[in-house]
Amino acid sequence: MLEDRRLEVLRAIVEDFVLSNEPVGSKALAERHNLGVSPATVRNDMSALEEEGYITQPHTSAGRIPTDKGYRLFVDRLSGVKPLSRAERRAIQSFLEGAVDLDDVVRRSVRLLAQLTRQVAVVQYPSLSSSSIRHIEVVTLGPYRLLMVLITDTGRVEQRIVDSLVPVDDEVAGELRSVLNCALAGRRLVDAPDIVAALPDSTRSELRPYLTTVAGAVLESLVERQEERIAMAGTANLTRSPVDFADSLRSILEALEEQVVLMKLIGSARETGTVTVRIGRETDVDALRSTAVVATGYGRGPFALGGMGVLGPMRMDYPGTMAAVRAVAKYVGELLGAD
């Protein structure tokens, strides 16, 4: 285990390198930070840190920069995540509360994360496996046409126009609405297909033709939404400091075009309130070895409805980024949990 003083030296190196993007020397560290020791002692500590793989010397005459291992230790030893100011929290809450529906919540969240962190932001729509049906509405559009609207507990809305082979009126629409909500309201989306498929056989014969048609529309809505959806913003932020990515910028952009990669990065966030940080090779994606990912889950209670996070260079402001991701996730969870 590293001595406390060497941990302080490593912390100072990370903080200075994040700010300057320049290798850090022992003299500069001693001058800028209250380490309580001479530059010579700092130099010895830096040599020890280098031997243990926490920092490296990019050029013969240059200072040191953190390695993946150094960033990892820095993050693991953070005493606390830097809290956002009251004004910042109020601004986040106000911006998100202006959303009119789920799509708007996701769009605002991903834009806000990208702006706050100046990184690439990714937000997963609420996972179907975690969502349930809040209400199903059925209304007549004409003598042979119905509108079916399915609303989830997270605000997802699916609409289907249903054509009927037999005339339909408001009384029939009301009865269909009652049957569907009695069977499905409060049930998880993943359980709904089996329930819907069995409905026509348990309904009075006069209503069966209508219910068969509407049930088919409900099933179509559920099947078509099995693929998880994500939103992304801020890819232009990667070009702010191309030196951080050397020759890997193109491969990073190509990797971000793959939804399976994005889901791998943020979809594994299963708990709310817990921020995870994956650095370099920890992303398990070859093209992203020069990046870091900060992610968390959002939702009501301990289990996440979905994940969100940011991707940027390993040389990032980890305390500030973690605070921003946690704050946005908290407010999104509260917003989606409101009745």
UniProtKB/Swiss-Prot annotation:
<dbReference type="InterPro" id="IPR036390">
    <property type="entry name" value="WH_DNA-bd_sf"/>
</dbReference>
<dbReference type="Pfam" id="PF01628">
    <property type="entry name" value="HrcA"/>
</dbReference>
<dbReference type="InterPro" id="IPR001034">
    <property type="entry name" value="DeoR_HTH"/>
</dbReference>
<keyword id="KW-0805">Transcription regulation</keyword>
<keyword id="KW-0804">Transcription</keyword>
<dbReference type="InterPro" id="IPR021153">
    <property type="entry name" value="HrcA_C"/>
</dbReference>
<comment type="similarity">
    <text>Belongs to the HrcA family.</text>
</comment>
<dbReference type="InterPro" id="IPR002571">
    <property type="entry name" value="HrcA"/>
</dbReference>
<protein>
    <recommendedName>
        <fullName>Heat-inducible transcription repressor HrcA</fullName>
    </recommendedName>
</protein>
<keyword id="KW-0346">Stress response</keyword>
<dbReference type="GO" id="GO:0045892">
    <property type="term" value="P:negative regulation of DNA-templated transcription"/>
</dbReference>
<dbReference type="GO" id="GO:0003677">
    <property type="term" value="F:DNA binding"/>
</dbReference>
<dbReference type="InterPro" id="IPR023120">
    <property type="entry name" value="WHTH_transcript_rep_HrcA_IDD"/>
</dbReference>
<dbReference type="Pfam" id="PF08220">
    <property type="entry name" value="HTH_DeoR"/>
</dbReference>
<keyword id="KW-0678">Repressor</keyword>
<dbReference type="InterPro" id="IPR036388">
    <property type="entry name" value="WH-like_DNA-bd_sf"/>
</dbReference>
<comment type="function">
    <text>Negative regulator of class I heat shock genes (grpE-dnaK-dnaJ and groELS operons). Prevents heat-shock induction of these operons.</text>
</comment>
<dbReference type="InterPro" id="IPR029016">
    <property type="entry name" value="GAF-like_dom_sf"/>
</dbReference>
<dbReference type="GO" id="GO:0003700">
    <property type="term" value="F:DNA-binding transcription factor activity"/>
</dbReference>
